[in-house]
Swiss-Prot record:
Residues 23-35 have a biased composition (Gly residues). Belongs to the universal ribosomal protein uL15 family. Keywords: Ribonucleoprotein, Ribosomal protein, RNA-binding, rRNA-binding. One of its GO terms (cellular component) is cytosolic large ribosomal subunit. This is Large ribosomal subunit protein uL15. One of its GO terms (biological process) is translation. One of its GO terms (molecular function) is structural constituent of ribosome. It comes from Lactobacillus johnsonii (strain CNCM I-12250 / La1 / NCC 533). Residues 1-13 have a biased composition (Basic and acidic residues). Residues 1-54 are annotated as: Disordered.
Amino acid sequence: MKLNELKPNEGSRRNRKRVGRGTSSGYGKTAGRGQKGQLARTGGKTRLGFEGGQMPLFRRMPKRGFKNVNRKEYAIINLNDLNRFDDGSEVTIDTLKSSGLVKKELAGVKLLANGELKVKLTVKVNKASEAAKKAVEAAGGTVEVI
């Protein structure tokens, strides 16, 4: 057996239906495109969201909001993420990056109070919610906003 002798199993691959090859094929004459109209013509298709000339839905809806170009996006760390660190250790942005909790280089790191903290830590982050600060201090640790 050679590579050029390999063939797929019988019936495992269907033949492509060739259109426009006579009326008895079932796909002759109009080749499955229907009668006249834009979709029967050659030369491309309509753009996404095109409704035949009717005002499309995305233009009927009112504009809303804007994107602030000066917005700062922070990497989010929750309290339950900090349980992987040893009791009494110091958690900085560098230790968060080396542990894989912070992947992207953003404006900084923000600590949020989702979950429960079970270890005593010294946390140094750019921002922290009030609830997160209280939870870290309740566990015996401190939060330092840098």
